[in-house]
């Protein structure tokens, strides 16, 4: 199905107001994009963090009369008659199919392969995780996920219990189970992530060994031999008191979702409870690991 997009340029302070205006004019979705392609890495909980110079992009059905949309927007106090905008007809593509065509099997460490569920595995004798990420984060393509998978591959997980804090697609918990863990526990704030993890666990034949919880439902007394959390630096710092009590004495901790420039502050939040290893970097991201005191 083809679409029409309307793009407005504004300041970050006005972006939310213009987003509302586009929705009222009939947009089916809104995207914020930095005019200068500068990334925003870490919005705080409940906050939409925006750039100083922001493009607000509304997506409209192809049958929409854009003259009517422009007329509605001209009445907005931030815009007015003759406001600057750009309207484009988007090419009709099967975006899901295009994404699937570009997702290939990937190897992490010595044993582990992450394979799209619609492709053949490259090595039948390897540890193969068949993945369909659905709407949740975690395909292995991001450096932070890659760092966590390589770390898990390097461990002897035989008979161990693993907690995946912020499980997303379930990729880390499922990889741990395929690498020999006896049990994994996935925790995520997003019900879609819980469902994606459940589906992927069933696809890999490990659903009987994977427990999944929203934070409000997780057991009070949870302990694991290995805890991995691939979220963001801010939540890792804020949740340090909670995450630090999850590993058993002598248990292992792996943290990622952290920019290299944020490593020191995250290390400080965990240094009292863990003997930390040297930070491992990949591109601009890093992984922090350690052993519980």
Curated annotation (Swiss-Prot):
Reactions it catalyzes: L-lysyl-[protein] + 3 S-adenosyl-L-methionine = N(6),N(6),N(6)-trimethyl-L-lysyl-[protein] + 3 S-adenosyl-L-homocysteine + 3 H(+); an N-terminal L-alpha-aminoacyl-[protein] + 3 S-adenosyl-L-methionine = an N-terminal trimethyl-L-alpha-aminoacyl-[protein] + 3 S-adenosyl-L-homocysteine + 3 H(+)
InterPro entries found in the cross-reference section: Ribosomal_L11_MeTrfase_PrmA, Ribosomal_PrmA_MeTrfase, SAM-dependent_MTases_sf
Membrane is among the record's keywords: no
Residue stretches in coiled coil: none
EC numbers on record: 2.1.1.-
Pfam family name, one: PrmA
Chief location: cytoplasm
Molecular function GO terms recorded: N-terminal protein N-methyltransferase activity; protein-lysine N-methyltransferase activity
Cellular compartments annotated: Cytoplasm
Entry keywords, A to Z: Cytoplasm, Methyltransferase, S-adenosyl-L-methionine, Transferase
Binding locations of S-adenosyl-L-methionine: 145, 166, 188, 230
Keyword Transferase: yes
Gene Ontology biological process terms, A to Z: methylation
Traits of the deletion mutant: Mutant lacks several methyl groups in protein L11. Null mutant is perfectly viable.
Record-linked HAMAP family: Methyltr_PrmA
Name of the protein this chain belongs to: Ribosomal protein L11 methyltransferase
Protein species of origin: Escherichia coli (strain K12)
């Amino acid at each position: 199905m083809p679409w029409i997009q309307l793009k407005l340029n504004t300041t970050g302070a006005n972006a939310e107001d213009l987003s509302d205006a586009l929705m009222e004019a009939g947009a089916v979705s809104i995207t914020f994009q930095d005019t200068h392609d500068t990334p925003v890495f870490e919005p705080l909980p409940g906050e939409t963090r925006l750039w100083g110079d922001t493009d607000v992009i509304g997506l409209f059905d192809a049958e929409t009369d854009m003259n009517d949309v422009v007329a509605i927007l001209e009445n907005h106090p931030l815009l007015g008659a003759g406001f600057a905008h750009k309207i484009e007809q988007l090419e009709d593509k099967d975006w899901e199919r295009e994404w699937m065509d570009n997702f290939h099997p990937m190897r992490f460490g010595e044993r582990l392969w992450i394979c799209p569920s619609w492709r053949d595995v490259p090595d039948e004798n390897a540890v193969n995780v068949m993945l369909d990420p659905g709407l949740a984060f975690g395909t292995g393509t991001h450096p932070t996920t890659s760092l966590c998978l390589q770390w898990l591959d390097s461990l002897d997980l035989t008979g161990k219990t693993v907690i995946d804090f912020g499980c997303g697609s379930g990729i880390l918990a499922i990889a741990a189970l395929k690498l020999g863990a006896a049990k994994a526990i996935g925790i995520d704030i997003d019900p879609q992530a819980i469902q994606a993890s459940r589906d992927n666990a069933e696809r890999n034949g490990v659903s009987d060994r994977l427990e999944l919880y929203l934070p409000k439902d997780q057991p009070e007394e949870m302990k694991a031999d290995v805890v991995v959390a691939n979220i963001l630096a801010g939540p890792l710092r804020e949740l340090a008191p909670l995450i630090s009590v999850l590993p058993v004495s002598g248990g292992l901790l792996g943290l990622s979702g952290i920019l290299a420039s944020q490593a020191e502050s995250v290390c400080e939040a965990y240094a009292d409870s863990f003997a930390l290893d040297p930070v491992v970097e990949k591109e601009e991201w890093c992984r922090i690991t350690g052993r519980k005191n």
